Amino acid sequence: MYYGRKIRLARGVQIHDGAMLNYRSGRGPYSINLTIGDGSKVMPGARLIPQQGYIKIGKNCTIQYGALLYGVGGLEIGDDCRIAAYTVITPMNHVFEDPVIPIREQGETAVGIKIGRDVWIGANAKILDGVVIGDGAVIGAGSVVTRDLPPLSIAVGTPARVIGKRGSRMRESVPNCLGSEIKRTRLT
């Protein structure tokens, strides 16, 4: 399927009521600045805003309620990804080096973000510009990803740090928010 000059939806894509696909802001050189692959779902309240860049979402992905995805520097999401509610992915950043000049007047940088296939991003996570997330990675809820993550890594925290690898046994105890410990035996 093809919608307008800036948006392309593949077969079986589900765009739920209340989701926003903003293609009007795309004034950049990209002929198509929003592409969503076969079988992917965009849930109510999710917003996809390419701006002057592009957003490319692979096959069988789910973008959950209230997620906010920008495309200024380019955003590529591989097949079979799960992006949980209220996640923010922003491939741009403000320049703030000069304390004399207001931040709004210093411009922006935009490198782009690449997310591999079969990645799960937990609720309220933030993914910042310039990051590459490897295939099969898992990002914990509320984490802020500021640097690249290797394939199959499990990352949590602010800033996110790798605490394990999918498919390997974790024998350590991980403190939970109440101060007690949770025993981890197998993460798959």
Residue ranges and their predicted role:
Residues G4, Q14-I127, T158, R166-G167:
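Flexible, glycine/small-residue-enriched loop-and-beta-strand segment within the central core
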Residues T90, E97-P99, R171-E181:
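Mobile, glycine-enriched helix-loop/loop "lid" segments at the mouths of ligand-binding/catalytic clefts
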Residues V132-V156, A160, S173:
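C-terminal/domain-terminus segments
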Residues I154-V156, I163, L178-S180:
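Non-catalytic C-terminal accessory region of glycerolipid acyltransferases
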Residues G164, M170-R171:
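Double-stranded beta-helix
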